[in-house]
Amino acid sequence: MAAAARGSGRAPTRRLLVLLLLQLLWAPAGVRAGPEEDLSHRNQEPPAPAQQLQPQPAAVQGLEPARAEKGLTPVAPVHTNKEDAAAQTNLGFIHAFVAAISVIIVSELGDKTFFIAAIMAMRYNRLTVLAGAMLALALMTCLSVLFGYATTVIPRVYTYYVSTALFAIFGIRMLREGLKMSPDEGQEELEEVQAELKKKDEEFQRTKLLNGPDVETGTSTAIPQKKWLHFISPIFVQALTLTFLAEWGDRSQLTTIVLAAREDPYGVAVGGTVGHCLCTGLAVIGGRMIAQKISVRTVTIIGGIVFLAFAFSALFISPESGF
């Protein structure tokens, strides 16, 4: 009985020892797991805020899914100065184009070249007159732009403010001329051009008579003419020379030179040519009717206001802005 009692008392003791050993084995692992988990949480950095991606071209968007599959971060678009420079160049061209076409229109409507084209179109072929006048005006515009562009060797700040002062002087002068001008000024200009063209026609007819055969002797006393006159219409040459000489030193030529010195030269050349084409085309198509309807006094006053507006705009635009 005593042996059985000792055997039964050892069994619970063994069980307690086994439980204590198991507890000692498991306890360090549990204690170590806690700090490691804490340290892992501490080492984790906070998630970076999501970047708002700008819409990109199709070629770039096609590359983004491939980069995402590889686990790479999408590349943000890089903006260069080329786009800004191109936008500024386009804006400068548009500004120069609008300035040139508006100034040419208010300067040429009712001008001497306008009446020359109008009167010659009533007497001769309109296309021939338009071609001769436009060739002269295009050549004059290109020469004026070259003269103005040659001044770019001077620092822009000087040419900018000098051209602004010239615009102000032209504007004040045109306003003064317009206010002092009589309502019949356009008619007087028209009559002056008619007299000049009549004189040219008489000289041309006299030349033709001298080139004709002599009735008494039956021989020709022709005056030698230049060979190129046989291939080019005399009307074309007359329209070209009259328009070129009338435009040389005119207010529109000086204005084109001033604009080319401060604006984009290509915009000034294109805008000036388009402006001349509109005015000359209007004169050729309308003829005398438009010449009599146009009030030179009103056009001159409007032109003075436009010139002063360009001069006033220089107070708000920096010379370094590029337009």
Curated annotation (Swiss-Prot):
Q: Where is the composition biased (Low complexity)?
A: 50-59
Keywords for this protein: Antiport, Coiled coil, Golgi apparatus, Membrane, Signal, Transmembrane, Transmembrane helix, Transport
Which residues are in coiled coils?
A: 184-211
Q: Which InterPro entries does the record associate with it? A: GDT1-like, GDT1-like_CS
Topology in the lipid bilayer is annotated as: Multi-pass membrane protein
Bias class Basic and acidic residues marks the residues at: 35-44
The record's section on Pfam families has: GDT1
Compartments (UniProt record): Golgi apparatus membrane
Which reaction(s) does the protein catalyse, per the Swiss-Prot or TrEMBL entry?
Ca(2+)(in) + n H(+)(out) = Ca(2+)(out) + n H(+)(in); Mn(2+)(in) + n H(+)(out) = Mn(2+)(out) + n H(+)(in)
Tissue-level expression reads: Expressed in mammary epithelial cells (at protein level).
For this entry, list what GO says about its biological process: calcium ion transport; Golgi calcium ion transport; intracellular calcium ion homeostasis; manganese ion transport; protein N-linked glycosylation; regulation of lysosomal lumen pH
Example GO CC term: the record gives:
Golgi membrane
Topology feature Lumenal, residues:
34-89, 148-151, 249-266, 320-323
Residues of the signal sequence?
A: 1-33
Q: Which family does it belong to?
A: Belongs to the GDT1 family.
Q: What is this protein called?
A: Putative divalent cation/proton antiporter TMEM165
Protein source organism? Mus musculus (Mouse)
